[in-house]
Amino acid sequence: MKESAACARNREFFSHEGMAGLMSSMANLAFPDATAGDFAINVLTVLILYGPAYLANTGAMLFGKWIPDKFGFENHKIDGGRIHSDGNRLLGDGKSWEGLIGGGIFSGILVMISHYIWEGNTPSSNRPFIDPLLISEPTDWFWIGNEWSAAFVLGFTLGLACMLGDMAGSFVKRRQGLKREGEVSSKAPLLDTLPFAIFIFLAAAILFKDQIMMHSDLAPPIIAIIVLTPIIHRSFNILGYRLGLKSVPY
């Protein structure tokens, strides 16, 4: 059986003999953070590694709203129009099955593109553009078939986590009477942003804990990204609004 490019690259990466080889591999996997500039680059590295998952909401708008509206397709609401005991919809019209699955697919495709562009890129010399499959192996649970399907499954899983976090935030907002009404924002920026970010990083910590995106050196930058998520989310929403993918800039 022909060895995949990722397997060959990983075998070569870890093939050095003895302690010198081990230290060399560890050095290549380290994320320098001696200066403020290094830390800023690591924050950008985290943003790029997790960017496909963060963009799941854009994919959800594409598959759940723009495409159905453009081609006259009917989307299917996740809550089926059901009303909670508080008199509000469980989730609302903004949460559809097409958006949920489409968001995951969008993220999966973006991780495949990232792997294609940055395959083999290491932290020691290529930050912030790191291969998301840098230390992945065929024995990993998400490696189904080959490296490309592995990249897709990784992205799809984190994108789905993003969408589930967004749904959780929406559910809580509606229970608190903070649901969005037409052009009026829900006035709950933290519930609009933090749940999906937390779900993404929790999913990564549980399901991809041995991957480069969960390297211990990236823990402080990950915390920084969570804190910055409201600003990042707002920026993506404005971009989606200007591209015509969203009807409102929030």
Q: Each PLM stretch: what is its role?
A:
Residues 206-209:
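Selective transmembrane helix interface/packing segments
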